[in-house]
Design a protein with these regions (language model features):
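Acidic catalytic motifs of isoprenoid enzymes
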Residues: 1-196
Length: 202
């Protein structure tokens, strides 16, 4: 529901101030959910999950909203360019890595592993998914004024912002894509190690 606030056609019509206000209200709703005061039926489902799985933490949910704010023009967290992989990692963690932290308490772990052990692979899966999304949507994002590919990587392979915006797919761009695809694959490998850590019924 929060993703639609910043990435739906309606969001573009309503503008960044409305996006920011809606996300602020979502943080308030989360606070109420965590003290068992849900606003509607969907909130009630999350509130019930929190009651049944007490190890659920509110922090990943708030972090995800911060990730949405990174896509909200005018907000102090907003970024439409990323200088380094470390900067982009923060974005990937917030919008996707957090999902692993949200679902792990519900999925549970095997008797031979702890939740803490399963967290790194869970995070890696979210990071891998988000890198994949970024690589899939390079052209679409560029049309919306966003370039998520780290500038340090683009510079390393001789790829310019103008080239990204114009959709020039030369050898430099292809080599950049190979580099980023390998990064995603490395995270998928790290994530795969977490599968045996999950509870069998998961």
């Amino acid at each position: 529901r929060t993703d639609d606030i910043v990435d739906s056609p309606l969001a573009a019509m309503l503008g960044p101030e409305r996006m920011e206000e809606d996300l602020r209200l979502w943080k308030e709703r989360l606070d109420r959910i965590w003290v068992q005061e849900p606003t509607d039926a969907l909130d009630m489902a999350l509130s019930d999950a929190k009651k049944n799985y007490p190890s659920m933490d509110i922090e990943p949910y708030n972090d995800m909203i911060d990730g949405m704010l990174m896509d909200t023009p005018g907000h102090q967290l907003f970024q439409d360019r990323y200088e380094t992989w470390d900067e982009l990692y923060t974005y990937c963690y917030r919008v996707a890595g957090t999902v692993g932290l949200m679902v792990l308490p519900v999925l549970g772990t095997s008797t031979t592993h702890t939740l803490e052990e399963a967290i790194p692979p869970g995070l890696s899966l979210g990071i891998a998914f988000q890198i994949t999304n970024i690589l899939r949507d390079v052209g679409e994002d560029a049309l919306r004024g966003r370039i998520y590919l780290p500038r340090e990587d683009m510079s390393k392979f001789g790829v310019t912002e103008e080239q990204i915006i114009k959709g020039v797919l030369d050898d430099n761009y292809k080599n950049l894509m190979k580099f980023e695809i390998q990064r995603a694959r490395d995270y998928y490998v790290e994530a795969e190690a977490g599968i045996p850590m999950l509870a069998p019924e998961a």
